[in-house]
Swiss-Prot record:
Its main location: cytoplasm. Keywords: ATP-binding, Chaperone, Cytoplasm, Nucleotide-binding, Stress response. InterPro entries: AAA+_ATPase, ATP-dep_Clp_protease_ClpX, ATPase_AAA_core, Clp_ATPase_C, HslU, P-loop_NTPase. It is found in: Cytoplasm. ATP binds at residues 26, 68-73, 271, 337, 409. GO terms for biological process: protein unfolding; proteolysis involved in protein catabolic process. GO terms for molecular function: ATP binding; ATP hydrolysis activity; peptidase activity; proteasome-activating activity. This is ATP-dependent protease ATPase subunit HslU. Belongs to the ClpX chaperone family. HslU subfamily.
Length: 459
């Protein structure tokens, strides 16, 4: 059975979590600290006596800030650090019960699906060595079928299989050596391979869960079937290992442990929550449905039971982190009950020119490094000077100030436009070295920046 410690929350300290986030995200220290503390509190809670543990509720977080400043990126990086079931959803995907669309309980189902998948992968890793041994035996059986004698119509297939003779054992050992040395990789063998019976069922919007259950039902009805296939050994091996690993893991234990992990350590990130907020100066229309989504979210965040195909989960101790730009609305426009369920508020800062310079140079996978590596595949060596980085950051900042502020995403647009010609011609410029300096940037982008009408449509 999977150990209960397999999926306990991350044991990283808040300082270590912030340091890890710093490798990928520039600035926003307040948001990083809040997320790090919340993640550490998951671990702290699990160290308490069970009676007290059930009384400690997670302190949900609301992140507020303009688009492109790192809210979603924090969530994406958090997923890799959490070592717990984690799901990110957009609030705009959901509608009030009774309207066409997904209901908010789908969040709980998605979380359990994620946990079961993660647990299953962990279980398969643990039994992989044994699965590889079984797969090897099946390949050898296909290469050298074992002799069997018929005793009668009612005889069991395993009971009538004879022990291999000394000659057969020697031949089998020889083939095993050849198999392990890779000499037989291209040899074709005939195998009985399990068939996954899948049926595509079209369902109306909002009824995806019913469609999933119907697909599962038809899959179970047709389960256990196999078909003969001729495959090269190198293609057959991964299929057989996967099949044998699936036989070795205990699905019931995986499901039970996954539900436990969701209830105790699950984390849900709800993005774009400001898009389901009713604006104070409007009445009726779509705002009715938006407020309905908030009311549907409320029991989920407060703590309720959600039915999934793996069993019922309680959401009392799931950590919810919500984020939104709140351009046209305010956090106070959320319904009061939901406001109270997000006691920790964090405001993310708009990005300055200095932040853009850091974004272009500091992160592990900075945009400039990405372009350098991409063009290196064509044999082109790309280098950015300091004054080029400064000018790119300045242009991105100016365009954001002049038009809609889309934060760091503006850098993608500016760099793509700057390097468009080079990216197009790079296959014909193998072996060249290209240095991007301030003059190069001005030559390619200067006119666009000067003309507000052009930059509005191109940058």
């Amino acid at each position: 059975m999977p150990s209960k410690t397999d999926f306990t929350s991350s044991t990283m300290t808040p300082r270590e979590i912030v340091q890890e986030l710093d490798r990928h995200i520039v600035g926003q220290q307040a948001a990083k600290r809040s997320v790090a503390i919340a993640l550490r509190n998951r671990w702290r809670r699990m160290q308490l006596p069970e009676e007290l543990r059930n009384e400690v509720m997670p302190k949900n977080i609301l992140m507020i800030g303009p688009t492109g400043v790192g809210k979603t990126e924090i969530a994406r990086r958090l997923a890799t650090l959490a070592n717990a079931p984690f799901v990110k959803v957009e609030a705009t995907r959901f509608t009030e019960v009774g309207y066409v669309g997904k209901d908010v309980e789908q969040i709980g189902r998605d979380l359990v699906d994620t946990a079961v998948k993660m647990y299953r992968e962990q279980a398969k890793v643990r039994v992989r060595t044994q699965a590889e041994e079984y797969a090897e035996e099946r390949i050898l059986d296909a290469l050298l079928p074992r002799r069997s004698v018929g005793i009668g119509f009612d005889a069991d297939a395993d009971a009538i299989r004879q022990e291999p003779s000394a000659h057969e054992s020697e031949t089998r050992a020889k083939f095993r050596r050849m198999l392990r040395s890779g000499e037989l990789e291209e040899r074709e063998i005939e195998l009985d391979v399990a068939v996954n019976v899948s049926m595509d069922i079209m369902t109306p919007p909002g009824m995806e869960e019913m469609g999933q259950q119907l697909r599962q039902m038809f899959s179970n009805i047709g389960g256990g079937k196999s078909q003969k296939r001729k495959l090269a050994i190198k293609a057959a091996r991964p299929l057989l290992i996967e099949e044998e690993a699936a036989k070795l893991v205990n699905e019931d234990e995986i499901r039970a442990a996954a539900i436990e992990a969701c209830e105790q350590n699950g984390i849900v990130f709800i993005d774009e929550i400001d898009k389901v907020v009713k604006r104070g100066d409007t009445v009726g229309g779509g705002d009715v449905s938006r407020e309905g989504v908030q009311r549907d979210l409320l029991p989920l965040v407060e703590g309720s039971n959600v039915s999934t195909k793996y069993g019922t989960i309680r959401t009392n101790h799931i950590l919810f982190i919500a984020s939104g730009a709140f351009h046209l609305t305010k956090p106070s426009d959320l319904i009061p009950e939901l406001q109270g369920r997000f006691p920790i508020r964090v405001e993310l800062d708009a990005l300055s020119k200095a932040d853009f310079i850091r974004i272009l140079t500091e992160p592990k996978a900075a945009l400039t490094k990405q372009y350098q590596e991409l063009l290196k595949t064509e044999g082109v060596s790309l280098d950015f000077t300091e004054d080029a980085i400064d000018r790119i950051a300045e242009i991105a900042y100016l365009v954001n100030e002049r038009q809609e502020n889309i934060g760091a995403r503006r850098l993608h647009t500016v760099l793509e436009r700057l390097l468009e010609t080079l990216s197009y011609e790079s296959p014909d410029r193998d072996g060249e070295s290209v240095t991007v300096d301030a003059d190069y940037v001005n030559a390619h982008l200067g006119e666009l920046v000067k003309d507000p009408d052009l930059s509005r449509y191109i940058l």
